[in-house]
Regions:
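Conserved glycine-rich Rossmann-like NAD(P)H-binding loop of the short-chain dehydrogenase/reductase
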Residues: 24-40
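Rossmann-fold cofactor-recognition segment
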Residues: 43-61
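Proline-glycine-enriched beta-turn/loop adjacent to the NAD(P) cofactor-binding site
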Residues: 83, 134, 175, 179-180, ...
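Catalytic loop of short-chain dehydrogenase/reductase
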Residues: 84, 88-104, 109-112, 119-120, ...
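C-terminal helical subdomain
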Residues: 169, 176-177, 184, 188-227
């Protein structure tokens, strides 16, 4: 039975991914800063296939502690889902420095730090997936909206490519995934996709690209996005 490690799996798309992989018969280990009631309830219905671990992704010490707790386990999939949206619609000159630091630390730096700490737990031929966004595509940025969020995801994409280069001898598939425009607390209330549709598509993409190696930036329909 396959085993997924989902980082930031308590709410929104992360929770949807936990639910999706459980429905496919996987074992799932999900991390959360503070587990939601929904995640705790899901554990009770999962017949022992869901483990919840505590993690604040921006704290290096907590990441190291998680790596120690998980030592000896192996995972077919490591999915890194941390993300926040700050300064929506604000001019960069109006966004506090603390918000700028927080969004880059959460959206770009921390996913790579966690991946570096946990990559050794991924089985040969396994997959490391990062929740990116088409807004992180530099070459398709024609409207400039959501500048801070867009820049943080572009930074994540650059770091994903560096991560893959550092792990070029490892038998891994590395995916930067765009979930589509989804109705979540971070998304728009009028977004065209619900969480279930998005995560089902993401899981299908991961399955379709299993064992392909290399790296790719792709959306939930398995369509390539230019970096």
């Amino acid at each position: 039975m396959k085993h997924a490690l989902i980082i930031a799996g308590s709410r929104g798309l992360g929770f949807g991914l936990v639910r999706e992989y459980l429905s496919r018969g996987w074992h799932v280990t999900a991390t959360a800063r503070t587990p939601s009631d929904e995640l705790a309830a899901l554990r009770g219905d999962a017949d022992g296939r869901l483990v919840i671990e505590s993690l604040e992704v921006t704290l290096i010490a907590q990441t190291a502690a998680l790596a120690t707790r998980l030592k000896g386990q192996s995972f077919d999939l490591l999915f890194l889902n941390p993300g926040i949206l700050l300064g929506r619609g604000a001019a960069l000159s109006d966004v506090p420095d603390s918000d700028i630091q927080n969004i880059f630390l959460t959206n770009a730096i921390s996913p790579i730090r966690v991946a570096d700490a946990l990559a050794y737990l991924v089985v040969p031929g396994g997959t490391i997936a990062f929740m990116s966004s088409d807004m992180g595509s530099v070459s398709t940025n024609d409207d400039g909206r959501a500048e801070l969020y867009r820049a943080s995801k572009a930074a994540l994409n650059s770091l994903i490519r560096s991560f893959r280069a550092r792990h070029d001898k490892d038998d891994l598939t590395v995916l930067a995934l765009h979930p589509g425009m989804v109705r979540t607390s971070m998304g728009r209330p009028d977004a065209p996709l619900d969480v279930d549709t998005s995560v089902r598509g993401l899981a299908n993409v991961i399955e379709a690209r299993w064992g392909s190696g290399g790296q790719v930036f792709v959306d939930y329909r398995n369509e390539i996005i230019p970096w």
